[in-house]
Amino acid sequence: MKTYSAKPESVKRDWYVVDASGKTLGRLATEVASRLRGKHKPEFTPHVDTGDYIVVINADKVAVTGKKASDKMYYRHTGYPGGLKEANFATLQAEKPEMIIEKAIKGMLPRNPLGRAMFRKLKVYAGTEHPHTAQQPQQLEI
């Protein structure tokens, strides 16, 4: 008997919604990244995108442990000389809370075209409302 290998056209993708309020950032990100890859499915194939769509709500209420709210720094560069920008967790959570979760999950996905396709299936929103009710996402407890 041969080993089963999933085909891209035969993959069934479900929609899930995850509430991030009160959840620890890293623990939430590892579970979401694993589901985006499809590692929870029996037909997981490393070279095929078998993951599900994940909608994360309440991104502004995600938690970190210890003093990371003031000590954890996020860096980006504008591309111009002297253009290194930095912000700590608390500042970024007030301005762009979606970016915190997206950056944490993106770092856990493969760094290739397949990883970018997986990342496109992630939808992050700061509040409780999201525009994906037509897809009837199932509640996912983490």
UniProtKB/Swiss-Prot annotation:
Q: What Pfam families does this protein map onto?
A: Ribosomal_L13
User: Which GO terms are recorded in the biological process aspect for this UniProt protein?
Assistant: negative regulation of translation; translation
Please report the organism this UniProt entry assigns to the protein.
Alcanivorax borkumensis (strain ATCC 700651 / DSM 11573 / NCIMB 13689 / SK2)
The protein's UniProt keywords, in alphabetical order, are: Ribonucleoprotein, Ribosomal protein
- What InterPro entries does the record tag this protein with? Ribosomal_uL13, Ribosomal_uL13_bac-type, Ribosomal_uL13_CS, Ribosomal_uL13_sf
Give the protein's biological function: This protein is one of the early assembly proteins of the 50S ribosomal subunit, although it is not seen to bind rRNA by itself. It is important during the early stages of 50S assembly.
* Name of this chain's protein: Large ribosomal subunit protein uL13
One GO MF term: mRNA binding
Q: Which NCBIfam families match?
A: rplM_bact
Concerning its family, UniProt says: Belongs to the universal ribosomal protein uL13 family.
What is one GO cellular-component annotation here?
A: cytosolic large ribosomal subunit
Subunit (UniProt): Part of the 50S ribosomal subunit.
